[in-house]
Amino acid sequence: MIARFLIAAAVIGSTAIRPLDAQSRPSAVFDWFEYTGHDSVFDKMRPGPNEFQNPILAGFYPDPSIVRRGDDYYLVNSSFSYFPGVPLFHSKDLVHWTQIGSVLTRPSQLQLDSAGVSRGIFAPVIREHAGTFYMITTIADRGNFVVTAKDPAGAWSDPVWLPEIADAIDPSLFFDDDGKAYVVNNGPPVGQPLYSGHRAIWVQQFDVAGMKLIGPRKVIVNGGVDISKKPIWIEAPHIFKHDGKYFLICAEGGTADQHSEVVFRADSPMGPYAPGPINPILTQRHLDPNRPFPITSTGHADFVETQNGEWWAVFLGVRPYGDNLYNTGRETWLLPVRWENGWPMILAGNATVPYVLQRPKLPAESAPKIAMSGNFAVRDDFASKTLAPYWEFVRTPRESFFDLMSHPGSLTLSARSAALGTRAQLSFVGRRQQHIDASASTAMRFTPTKPGEIAGLVAFQTDDFNYLLGVTLVNGKRSVQLIERDGRVPNKAPITVVTAPIPGAAGATVYLKITARGDKYDFSYATEPGQWTTLKADADGTILSSKVAGGFSSNFVGAMFGMYAYSP
């Protein structure tokens, strides 16, 4: 069933966003946008009574962090250079999640000017203490900060920067039961690194009242579980207390197919920490990559204890469609944590991450209006005065470029001079591709008035890797055109793949559709509803994968489908 909704996003503060003279530029009007995803694995592995389906957040929702207050659970993810930043979800059963907004909704909180798509916000962590919620995170190349809120669904504070850990990433907060607090983070090792990927985990006390770090800063893990094996990228640390002991969990191995989760234990938050007898406590790196419906790259976990005393882990994982290729990005998964001989274990031995398993022992919620797992379809008729919370922009907006009021029941985008292929803040409103087999379609009215003007649908991975299916002017005729950007070609020049004239009146509605089928994408158009003409079939979808679009060491995002408008 298609979900139709009137869910309002957090209002984006107008401070520092300039009004745009819409009369000076053409506009594209989108009457609706429909996303449909249908992966065969979700048909083959359907949850039964008292079961749930993984991933709990399908698509590009990596680096999950979770917290409980009472019987309410809140979860955040990395957003990199998309705005609003840090999507925020709520659940009461750990299975059904509803996005209630984003943490960083104002330009004063998040400045992403000219940032690469995989820079921006890394690994946010959400915690609650004494009635206040805290979100601590890294903004790549700029440092680390904390924001706070009494109500996580409400407005969050402006950032409080932590200059003491300017060289760090992945900070996490731990509030001890004696009233003290600590920040633990990834940072460079003491002295010169011994090998590529050599990192360390540091800890320092945090003054909650002063919102600053105090006291000595200390390395508690050097390299990883066993530095003699040259482990890489020990990161994403979190400290928990259980039965009087302090547990440190970290990701190790880099966020690709060698990813894992490891654990250490100490008698004090400041250490010393000893690795557990069985490490890693979660990985899939030793399994056959050609197994059916593989889940790989698992790690970057966070733990939560339910009100019933159960422990659960959220973590990232990916669903490749072949040869370590995936366009859906790193997704959020849920598994129980077992305590064995005083140590936590998520998944041992050759066990595979299950798509279906028994639900937590919590009162079941009804399915959310907008599904986040399994197969589903979502249609936005733009009937609300605000955008739904899952819509994203590329980088922080500095001028108004869209509205929902000038054409009620439609989304209007101003065709500005911010172009695909640059690090500009585009006239782009997009949502995640959440399935390997998916489609995005829209109905658009756009009348280009000069060569170069174009508006339509984009399949977007990065500035240098994307497809644009748009309406433009070619030899004085309104035409539909497919433009490919493959950053591997010389000068990263865009390629016009195919062009076709559009029959009918200049201002008539054009329907556009992008269909993903694993590594193949089809691009279609119509002038009447449902009467699709294929403009291009079997286009190379691997350019929208993390592996091709930069590689796993520099590309951390998934593909987006979105609406776009441009005028030179």
Task: List each model region and its residues.
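Bacterial N-terminal signal peptides
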Residues: 4-16
